[in-house]
Amino acid sequence: MSGKGEGPAIGIDLGTTYSCVGVWQHDRVEIIANDQGNRTTPSYVAFTDSERLIGDAAKNQVAMNPVNTVFDAKRLIGRRFSDSSVQSDMKLWPFKIQAGPADKPMIYVEYKGEEKEFAAEEISSMVLIKMREIAEAYLGVTIKNAVVTVPAYFNDSQRQATKDAGVIAGLNVMRIINEPTAAAIAYGLDKKATSVGEKNVLIFDLGGGTFDVSLLTIEEGIFEVKATAGDTHLGGEDFDNRMVNHFVQEFKRKSKKDITGNPRALRRLRTSCERAKRTLSSTAQTTIEIDSLYEGIDFYSTITRARFEELNMDLFRKCMEPVEKCLRDAKMDKSTVHDVVLVGGSTRIPKVQQLLQDFFNGKELCKSINPDEAVAYGAAVQGAILSGEGNEKVQDLLLLDVTPLSLGLETAGGVMTTLIPRNTTIPTKKEQVFSTYSDNQPGVLIQVYEGERARTKDNNLLGKFELSGIPPAPRGVPQITVCFDIDANGILNVSAEDKTTGQKNKITITNDKGRLSKDEIEKMVQEAEKYKSEDEEHKKKVEAKNALENYAYNMRNTIQDEKIGEKLPAADKKKIEDSIEQAIQWLEGNQLAEADEFEDKMKELESICNPIIAKMYQGAGGEAGGPGASGMDDDAPPASGGAGPKIEEVD
């Protein structure tokens, strides 16, 4: 334990399509399965007229309720509504998105009959809460501390927004780390004993929605990210889409019907395609069978692995480009890469493995760690290190992350002057002296940008501030020191100081555009609590309803049992039967009643049935004898307590 009484620190891989959680325990990492027994949980949140669902339950009902089922929140987090990637993604999502204040994309759903709006951070926080609960259920303690991973590509505002999601979920996010770095840690632990000297490792991470390639060097437990590249919009879902389109065309040819306007049909087809894709990684062909796909028409078809590869060949080939770019950026030849590590479920596709292996001239790929779990595995190790729980096995792992994009400021003529080049190891600090470019200039505007282009207009403005009060002087005379300082979480502080007057000003770039304010986070934390208590209420309701239902049906079965039925006076038997009938009728009409209504109904029913049954047992005491009587009790429904174990299964 971390000695803070907060249970161990967990590692969470918050994925675009699936998330995964791990913890360091008994000197190794445990990847924790959810209540469905799955070691990964869909990053889905659904809202219905009666409840909120997260994870498998949400994904399973997406066909019935596409407009109120939110997924892909990671594609929105820390972005602006007007961002071109948000605009193009919106076309593919069934749920509604509109621009909120400050150009922030807001998600609209209907929940319990009213329209609700959520920021991407809130949706992600719900997934994080789910992951935390999965860990808590397994460990039996409350958990506060977590390490959360993000793509190496994420810029500052996306990292910050992910951190905010953690805060809303009631977590203390100890560190945000890059996914490839996490995978490398998982891998480093596996390989550490044997390695001597520096190793270059290429992490090839092809997940459900994104693709990242990173090149790291590992030496004596020190990890350094040398370069990153990738495509934020390439992944398993794209392969599914190709297959979906293929079958939509086939359905058009066979039945002259176009299903593209029907979200439910498309969703059912997509679910089948996803399953088929997974099957094709281990078999040469598979079938798709969907009853009554559209207007009552059944759809049966087969697809071979070769056809699947042909549909996606251009995408598979595209996966190799970032690998080349990554090597170029790191100024490294592919022959100097010691290991190629596969991460992400889509790396199970044989063709992807083959292309990658060919690129590295037949080199064996590392598949020793389950590709779905490697990132959470590494995050859990990092959590153990940060909370001082790990043993000597992990303590000497040091983690050096890098900045994914160059950071700098605008100088005369809109030129980007870089202070911190991309792929610089962080934490880092750089200073440079600037001056004024006109005589008697009273102040300078410091504009901070991230990006690789030569002109600032092509890069991303992170923030700006004014340093004023510069005493009149000819141009080029004042000495203004600008300092860029990035901490271990990749959060940037920029300060400027006029050397002559000591005038100072600074800015923390936690990307205020689209960044949540303290108040908003506070409000969202309260909302999260509210939703949690509503979920609890709903669970209580379901349990009370099930208890009543179990009691009524058990009682009905009991009095229908001949051994018991014949011992009951007819009037009593009728009285019980009527009260049960009435209760079952009431149940059917009041599925959405409150928990206490169900409990009252239960008490009412018990007050009628229990005395009669008890009287019967006392009366039967003579013939039945001691043991007999207790034997009867097993049939007779005990009060709500007896429904206990059954309830859990229903829920």
Curated annotation (Swiss-Prot):
Gene3D superfamilies: 1.20.1270.10, 3.30.30.30, 3.30.420.40, Actin, Chain A, domain 4, Substrate Binding Domain Of DNAk, Chain A, domain 1. It is found in: Cytoplasm, Cytosol; Nucleus. CDD domains: ASKHA_NBD_HSP70_HSPA1. Disruption phenotype: No visible phenotype under normal growth conditions. The double mutants hsp70-1 and hsp70-4 exhibit accelerated bolting, flowering, and branching, small round shape and flat leaf blades, thin stems and short siliques. The double mutants hsp70-1 and hsp70-4 exhibit reduced tolerance to abiotic stresses, such as heat, cold, salt and osmotic shock. InterPro entries: ATPase_NBD (IPR043129), Heat_shock_70_CS (IPR018181), HSP70_C_sf (IPR029048), HSP70_peptide-bd_sf (IPR029047), Hsp_70_fam (IPR013126). It comes from the Eukaryota. GO terms for cellular component: apoplast; chloroplast; cytoplasm; cytosol; cytosolic ribosome; Golgi apparatus; nucleolus; nucleus. Residues 618-651 are annotated as: Disordered. The keyword Nucleus applies. Expressed at a substantial level during normal growth in root, stem, leaf and flower tissues, but not in siliques. Expressed in cotyledons, leaves, stems, vascular bundles, roots, stigmas and anthers. The keyword ATP-binding applies. One of its GO terms (molecular function) is ATP-dependent protein folding chaperone. Residues 619-629 have a biased composition (Gly residues). The modification N-acetylserine is found at residue 2. GO terms for biological process: defense response to bacterium; defense response to fungus; defense response to other organism; heat acclimation; negative regulation of seed germination; response to heat; response to virus; stomatal closure. Induction: Induced by heat shock and cold. Induced by dehydration stress and abscisic acid (ABA). Up-regulated by viral infection. Belongs to the heat shock protein 70 (TC 1.A.33) family. DnaK subfamily. Plants overexpressing HSP70-1 show disabled immune responses, enhanced tolerance to heat shock and altered plant growth and development. Plants overexpressing HSP70-1 are hypersensitive to abscisic acid (ABA) in seed germination assays, and are compromised in the dark- and ABA-induced stomatal closure. In cooperation with other chaperones, Hsp70s are key components that facilitate folding of de novo synthesized proteins, assist translocation of precursor proteins into organelles, and are responsible for degradation of damaged protein under stress conditions. Probably involved in defense response. Chaperone involved in protein targeting to chloroplasts. May cooperate with SGT1 and HSP90 in R gene-mediated resistance towards the oomycete Hyaloperonospora parasitica (downy mildew). Plays a role with WPP-domain proteins in facilitating WIT1 nuclear envelope targeting. Binds to the deubiquitinating enzyme AMSH3. Interacts with SGT1B (via SGS domain). Interacts with OEP61. Interacts with HSFA1A/HSF1. Interacts with BAG3, BAG4 and BAG5. Interacts with WPP1, WPP2 and WIT1. Component of a ternary complex composed of WPP1, HSP70-1 and WIT1. Binds to TIR. This is Heat shock 70 kDa protein 1. It comes from Arabidopsis thaliana. The lineage of its organism: Eukaryota, Viridiplantae, Streptophyta, Embryophyta, Tracheophyta. The gene is HSP70-1.
